[in-house]
């Protein structure tokens, strides 16, 4: 009698997908308005100059320029250094 008894279904074998969080544009990278710089939960990075923050704490560029990361008073800030204005 080389038979197996009917096995019950496994209760394992599922997991949630990753959330794709983190830095999307790194220091000195060029950005245009609307580019997402950081996707995060909470304010791991705080908004600095020329960036906005969405309701899910996503930091995005408001002006064309280059990304800048800095630390002030123990907090990490993300900003955008604007491109030099064209000569009039």
From Swiss-Prot:
Protein name per its UniProtKB record: Large ribosomal subunit protein bL27
Gene Ontology molecular-function annotations: structural constituent of ribosome
Residue numbers spanned by region Disordered: 1-24
Keyword annotations from UniProtKB, A to Z: Ribonucleoprotein, Ribosomal protein
NCBIfam families, per the entry: L27
Residues of the signal peptide: none
Superkingdom: Bacteria
Organism: Methylobacterium radiotolerans (strain ATCC 27329 / DSM 1819 / JCM 2831 / NBRC 15690 / NCIMB 10815 / 0-1)
UniProt KW Ribosomal protein keyword: yes
GO cellular component, one term: cytosolic large ribosomal subunit
Family designation: Belongs to the bacterial ribosomal protein bL27 family.
UniProt cross-references to InterPro entries, sorted A to Z: Ribosomal_bL27, Ribosomal_bL27_CS
Any single GO BP term: translation
A family per Pfam: Ribosomal_L27
């Amino acid at each position: 009698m080389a038979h197996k008894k009917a096995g019950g279904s496994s209760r394992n074998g599922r997991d949630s997908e990753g959330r794709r969080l983190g830095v999307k544009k790194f220091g000195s990278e060029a950005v245009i308005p609307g580019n997402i710089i950081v996707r995060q939960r909470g304010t791991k990075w705080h908004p600095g100059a020329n960036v906005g923050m969405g309701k899910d704490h996503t930091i995005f560029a408001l002006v064309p320029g280059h990304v800048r990361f800095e630390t002030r008073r123990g907090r990490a800030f993300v900003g955008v250094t604007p491109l030099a204005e064209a000569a009039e």
